[in-house]
Amino acid sequence: MTDKLIIRGGKKLAGTLQVDGAKNSAVALIPAAILAESEVVLEGLPDISDVHTLYNILEELGGTVRYDNKTAVIDPTDMISMPLPSGNVKKLRASYYLMGAMLGRFKKAVIGLPGGCYLGPRPIDQHIKGFEALGAKVTNEQGAIYLRADELKGARIYLDVVSVGATINIMLAAVRAKGKTVIENAAKEPEIIDVATLLTNMGAIIKGAGTDTIRITGVEHLHGCHHTIIPDRIEAGTFMVLAAASGKGVRIENVIPTHLEGIIAKLTEMGVPMDIEEDAIFVGEVEKIKKVDIKTYAYPGFPTDLQQPLTALLTRAEGSSVITDTIYPSRFKHIAEIERMGGKFKLEGRSAVINGPVQLQGSKVTATDLRAGAALVIAALLADGETEIHGVEHIERGYSKIIEKLSAIGANITRSSAAETKL
C-alpha cells in the first residue's frame, strides 16, 4: 500500500525553511565520483530516495559509501564495470549518468533502461549521439543499453536539443578521453556548473560550463576531492510559491538568488513582497495575487519544474492566468487533481488557463509525479478542510523531510500509511 499525506488547510504559515542541496546536482555528482581514483567527499547532499538509490548502485559496483547526515564519502578505488540490472536503475531516471561515468572510467557499461517520473517522451538519443561521437559503440539489447569503446577520443558534438542530461553525460565521458571535446548548444543550468566544478577539483580541464559552448581537454587520471553541492533552486522556488500562497512571513535560507531570477520576477509581478538577501529570501504576506502569464524555457528562463507549483498559487489570482510549458507540453496531470478541489482550468494545447480567484476545498487527490506532488501540497495548504494526497513516494523523491519542514512553520500535515486507514 502507498502512504498518503493528510493536510488540513487554511492556516497561515510563518518561520524559516532551510533549502537542501540540489537534487539535480546530487544525481550527477554521485556517479561522477566513479571517475576518480581516490576518495571523493560530497557535502550538503539532500536526504532523498534518489540519492540513497545511487549509493546502493555504487556499492553494487564495488565502491564503498559512508554516509553521515548530509555528507557522503565515496571510495571508487575498487570499482569494476559490471552490468547494472534494472532493479535500482529503474527507480530513477538520472541513473543514465552512470553511463557517462562508467564509460569514462572503464570504457564499457551495461545499464537497464532508466526510470523516474514519466513526463512523456524524454529519450536519451542526444546522450547516445555524444557517446558515439567520442568513439563508443552503443546498442540496445533486451531493454538494456550496452556501451563499449576501445578508446574514447575527443570530438566536436552539437546537441540538437538543449539537454541538461546529455550535456552532463557527455562531460562525464569526455573528461578522461584523449584530446579535446567541444559541446555546442550545451545546457547552461547551474547544476552543470556544479558538476564541472567537482570534475575540475578532481583534475579535469573544463572551460565554459554555464555557457552554450563547453570545452574539455581530456586527462588520463582524476583524483578525489572535497566538494559542497549548490542549494536546490527548485526546492527554494517551491518554498517561495508556498510562502506566497499561505505565508504570513516566511524566510527561506540557503539559496543563491541569481539562480532564482525567473521565479523572483514572476512573484514580484504577482504582487508578492520579498526581501532578497545574499543567501536568503524573505517572502512577506500577500493580500491579493495579480494574474500573470508564464512561459517555461531552458535556464535562465522560467523553469518547467516550478510551473506546476505555481498553478496552485494562481487559483488565488484575480482573473485568468496562462501557463505555457514549452519544455514538457504534457506536464499538466496535476490540473485534473486540483479541479477535484474546485480549481477552474482550461487546457489548450501546451497551455493551461487558470481562472481565479477560487477557494479550494479539501479532497482526495493523487500525485502523479514529483512537481505535481508539490503543487498538490500547496493547493492543500490553501484549501478549506482536509486533503488526502496519495503518491507520497513521488514527493519524497525530490523534497527531503517535507513533513518536518512544513510542520515547523505551522502547517497541519501528517503522513499515514494507507493500510492503517482500512483497519
From Swiss-Prot:
Positions annotated to bind phosphoenolpyruvate: 23-24
Keywords, sorted A to Z: Cell cycle, Cell division, Cell shape, Cell wall biogenesis/degradation, Cytoplasm, Peptidoglycan synthesis, Pyruvate, Transferase
GO BP terms: cell division; cell wall organization; peptidoglycan biosynthetic process; regulation of cell shape; UDP-N-acetylgalactosamine biosynthetic process
Pathway(s) served: Cell wall biogenesis; peptidoglycan biosynthesis
Residues binding UDP-N-acetyl-alpha-D-glucosamine: 93, 122-126, 305, 327
InterPro entries linked: Enolpyruvate_Tfrase_dom, Enolpyruvate_Tfrase_sf, MurA_subfamily, RNA3'P_cycl/enolpyr_Trfase_a/b, UDP_GlcNAc_COvinyl_MurA
A GO MF term: UDP-N-acetylglucosamine 1-carboxyvinyltransferase activity
Broad EC category: transferase
Cellular localisation: Cytoplasm
Main localization of the protein described in the UniProt heading: cytoplasm
Active site: 117 (proton donor)
Catalysis performed (reactions): phosphoenolpyruvate + UDP-N-acetyl-alpha-D-glucosamine = UDP-N-acetyl-3-O-(1-carboxyvinyl)-alpha-D-glucosamine + phosphate
Protein family: Belongs to the EPSP synthase family. MurA subfamily.
HAMAP family: MurA
Role: Cell wall formation. Adds enolpyruvyl to UDP-N-acetylglucosamine.
Stored NCBIfam families: murA, PRK09369.1, PRK12830.1
Protein name per UniProt: UDP-N-acetylglucosamine 1-carboxyvinyltransferase 2
Native species: Listeria monocytogenes serotype 4b (strain F2365)
Originating gene: murA2
